[in-house]
Amino acid sequence: VLTEAGLAPRFTEAAEKGEIKVRDATCPAIHTALQAAEKGVPYMPIGGVIGSDLIAGRPDWKVVDDLLIVPALRPDVALFHARWADEAGNVWVGRRRELATVAHASRQTLVTYEELKKGDMLEEELLATGVISTVYISATAHAPKGAWPLGVAGVYAPDDMHLSQYARAAKTREGFQRYLEEWVLTPRKSFSPA
């Protein structure tokens, strides 16, 4: 979903044409599957999904004693953008603790960040609870405005006009290709989005 711009047209078309496989799930079920991988167990139970029509389309999910059993979800690579990384290689995600779960569950975690903080954020009491340890981070790269056209809380807001521009361009494969050539594939010496 592209905020106010609606659904992501290229993803939607690829799913409709069967070019990518989409498996329906709930956020709690996905989080539980990631927690199973994080803990190194093959599956984990979750309550509250029983009775959902999603279960019929998920042969990998099992119901046992009124609990849904979901298999571990272990991503090959997690990619995300954070506000801060530090000199020790730790990454601050604040209250976005689901990112810590994803990092713990993944085989590799690659993070771009807005600003480098001196020292070790795990030693700063006010920041430590929102930090993912370098143990779970494979690599970081400084990328100011790296979330653009999306936003970073407390740093910059989403660029809704550009997201709308992308959504219009991405309605066709040709428009999407032109967008990629202009905004993604063309090297820039500097970048200063609105």
Residue spans for each PLM region:
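Conserved alpha/beta enzyme-core scaffold
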Residues: V1-A194
